Amino acid sequence: MTVENFNKTKIKICGLRRREDILAVNEAKPDYCGFIIEFPKSIRSVTADEIRELVNDLSPDIQPVGVFVNAPMELVKALMDEGTLAMAQLHGQENESYITELKAHTDKPVIKAFSIKTADDMENALQSPADYILLDQGSGGTGKTFDWSLIPKFQDVEIRTVRQ
């Protein structure tokens, strides 16, 4: 695994559902655009067919990220294989074997989100086979943060950042 240093913060705008949202994102020029895929509990969820259409309008300079919550592996693989997605972000209870199987199937990055409440949660996140880890307070999209004081305990650990 390679440590990558960046001089700028990476931006991902997430939860887009409409063509007009995509056109606005193209103007804003974030690094990544996240789509919540086939998760009916979210009002921001899109179907596989909808994301295929939306990505057609996305600027090629913006990488599409599929955000999945306990999705069937076949859905994630299909969207990555066909080139709809540049990477997958897993936000459910996907275990190590799920992540390992997905990584064996694709060379595209896999991000795993972890809810951080304790130092043990941090330790578990750092053991993940995912290409990158995302540290979160729990359910995404709330704007709430976790206790960032847990991070300094791991300063000697190789930090992985999302590739461009």
Where do the language-model regions lie?
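Conserved N-terminal beta1-alpha1 strand-loop-helix module at the mouth
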Residues: 1-164
